[in-house]
From Swiss-Prot:
Quaternary structure, from the entry: Homodimer.
Annotated metabolic or biological route of this protein: Lipid metabolism; fatty acid biosynthesis
Function: Catalyzes the condensation reaction of fatty acid synthesis by the addition to an acyl acceptor of two carbons from malonyl-ACP. Catalyzes the first condensation reaction which initiates fatty acid synthesis and may therefore play a role in governing the total rate of fatty acid production. Possesses both acetoacetyl-ACP synthase and acetyl transacylase activities. Its substrate specificity determines the biosynthesis of branched-chain and/or straight-chain of fatty acids.
Location of this chain's protein in the cell: Cytoplasm
Organism in which the protein naturally occurs: Prochlorococcus marinus (strain MIT 9301)
Protein name: Beta-ketoacyl-[acyl-carrier-protein] synthase III
Gene: fabH
Key word Lipid metabolism present: yes
Molecular function via GO: 3-oxoacyl-[acyl-carrier-protein] synthase activity; beta-ketoacyl-acyl-carrier-protein synthase III activity
Length: 335
């Protein structure tokens, strides 16, 4: 990081990328493990299959591949990237996975760090990164969302094991002194409701030295109160988006695409209905990938760009929500 450019007033979006593992876990295969069925899962979640990491598909590798394709779309020299922010709750290294991605990319001039906010993580990382760029300290950044929640699922719990998959997505963002394509944003946290969705540490006491308790580090599987999380999402997400529309003087009619965290198709449809956004404007790929946590939003955006759905100057309303409980919204113009 070098000097500060006080002329930088906004950000523009230059590229997107994504990666999912090859291994596919269908609803039919899950029904061989727990008491469920393809029809039951599909009708309640909208999910048909999800991608599951095999050896080599860790967050470092998935995040690297997503970032690389975003950089290629942006047509950047890797040496000009000066900031990498990785949103993840499942780092391959508990001390942080972003530095490993930086090294693998060869982005020697980039500062790299992780940010943890679960399913809101990518949106929080996008907003945080944009503020760094607007502050004039950085010029080009990669924001990555990557998670490997399959490693933390109780595969005997049919309420939660049907939901999650693995993957990564990334956006390439550049500072500009002419306009700001991050039109507006808002973020919220309510720790009082944190027990509705968590992945708590599980400390086992080891006797290593007499009269001293040593706690070995481990994590319990994902714990979720699905009914409460659903009620939280369908209530809070429309509220925060409506407030954002009012703050930015936009209306839902001016939105080209609604991109929500891909948790459940019923949540996506309910939020769209509350905002009076037609179903054809709601982007969804959870049928193929399930809930990939911090990866869902950039993964949806990248697929929509590469299929020529999202185009230059399209207005995208997006919201992430999940464990914390945390949630947020952003209004962006692509390009």
């Amino acid at each position: 990081m070098e000097g500060i450019d006080f002329n930088q007033i906004g950000v523009s979006f230059k590229g997107s990328g994504s990666y999912v593992p090859d291994q596919i876990l269908t609803n039919q295969k899950i029904s061989q493990k727990v008491d469920t069925s393809n029809e039951w899962i599909k009708s309640r979640t909208g999910i048909s299959e999800r991608r599951i990491s095999s050896l080599g598909d860790n967050v470092n590798e998935m995040g690297y591949k997503a970032a690389l394709t975003a950089i290629e779309m942006a047509n950047w020299d890797i040496k000009t990237v000066d900031l990498i922010v990785l949103a993840t709750s499942t780092p391959h290294d508990l001390f942080g996975s972003a530095p490993s991605i930086q090294a693998k990319l060869g982005a020697a001039n980039a500062v790299a760090f992780d940010l943890t906010a679960a399913c809101s993580g990518f949106l929080f990382a996008l907003i945080t990164t944009s503020q760094f760029l607007k502050g004039g300290s950085f010029k080009r950044a990669i924001v990555i969302g990557a998670d490997q929640l399959s490693s933390f699922v109780d595969w005997n719990d049919r309420r939660s094991c049907i939901l999650f998959g693995d993957g990564a997505g990334a956006l390439a963002i550049e500072a500009t002194n002419q306009f700001d394509n991050l039109i507006g944003f808002d973020m919220r946290t309510d720790g009082e409701r944190g027990s509705f969705l968590n992945l708590p540490s599980k400390n086992n006491k080891d006797l290593i030295i007499d009269n001293i308790d040593f706690l070995s580090g481990a994590f319990s599987p994902i714990q979720m109160n699905g009914q409460e999380v659903y009620k939280f999402a369908v209530r809070e997400v429309p509220i925060i988006l409506e407030k954002l529309f009012n703050k930015t003087h936009y209306t839902s009619d001016e939105v080209d695409w609604l991109v929500l965290h891909q948790a459940n198709q019923r949540i996506l449809d309910s939020v769209g209905d509350r905002l009076k956004i037609p179903r054809e404007k709601i982007l969804s790929n959870l049928e193929k990938y399930g809930n990939t946590s911090a990866a869902t939003i950039p993964l949806v955006i990248d697929e929509a760009i590469r299929s020529n759905r999202i185009k230059q100057n399209d207005i995208i309303a997006t919201s992430g929500f999940g464990a914390g409980l945390s949630w947020g919204a952003a209004l962006i113009k692509w390009g």
